[in-house]
Amino acid sequence: MDKFTTLTGIAAPLPLINVDTDMIIPKQFLKTIKRSGLGVNLFDEMRYDDDGNEIPDFVLNQDAYRKAEIIVAGDNFGCGSSREHAPWAIKDFGIRCVIAPSFADIFYNNCFKNGILPIALPQEQVDVLMKDAEKGANARMTVDLETQTVTTSDGEVFSFDLDPFKKRCLMEGLDDIGLTMEKISAIDSFEQSAAQARPWV
């Protein structure tokens, strides 16, 4: 998993509440078990019309935001079903950070497992960031995981809380497999001891 330390990039404003996982990646794209290739279908029903043409008004179809790496969204982002394809699609598009007043619990935890930093901030601070994001490509936000801060293009700084274990996993690029591999020596030692103690197993 890619490490996350500091990110300076374009933030796309998505001022919608209750953005559920079906909006993030519709059910027809859930057949794959690959984590790559889903970015083109991120927010599919909002990005494309029935003929597959881009809807110009949608934020990620606008030239200023096509290379966005941050999303600033409304309350309860990632609600709905627990599909892990949602963070897969977000990551595959190029988004590494989502900022919102709140997140659905399962989506929130899935983000960390896929190298995405979800940041929960008070509504009034999200409103400031939303306005900053609306400035377009010339306005770049900086997210510093080490200091747990978000800095606007105007230099305004907001601090966020984060579980130390989740922070470590992101900064070191550790997913579930990586965490297991950290303990591989202890696992091997246990298995050898268990085999000697119970050779009949």
Curated annotation (Swiss-Prot):
Catalytic reaction(s) noted: (2R,3S)-3-isopropylmalate = (2S)-2-isopropylmalate
GO molecular function: 3-isopropylmalate dehydratase activity
InterPro entries: 3-IsopropMal_deHydase_ssu, Aconitase/3IPM_dehydase_swvl, AconitaseA/IPMdHydase_ssu_swvl, IPMI_Swivel, LeuD
Pathway membership, UniProt: Amino-acid biosynthesis; L-leucine biosynthesis; L-leucine from 3-methyl-2-oxobutanoate: step 2/4
Protein keywords: Amino-acid biosynthesis, Branched-chain amino acid biosynthesis, Leucine biosynthesis, Lyase
Pfam family, one: Aconitase_C
Matches recorded under PANTHER family: 3-ISOPROPYLMALATE DEHYDRATASE SMALL SUBUNIT, 3-ISOPROPYLMALATE DEHYDRATASE SMALL SUBUNIT 2-RELATED-RELATED
Family: Belongs to the LeuD family. LeuD type 1 subfamily.
Function: Catalyzes the isomerization between 2-isopropylmalate and 3-isopropylmalate, via the formation of 2-isopropylmaleate.
Subunit relationships: Heterodimer of LeuC and LeuD.
Name of the featured protein: 3-isopropylmalate dehydratase small subunit
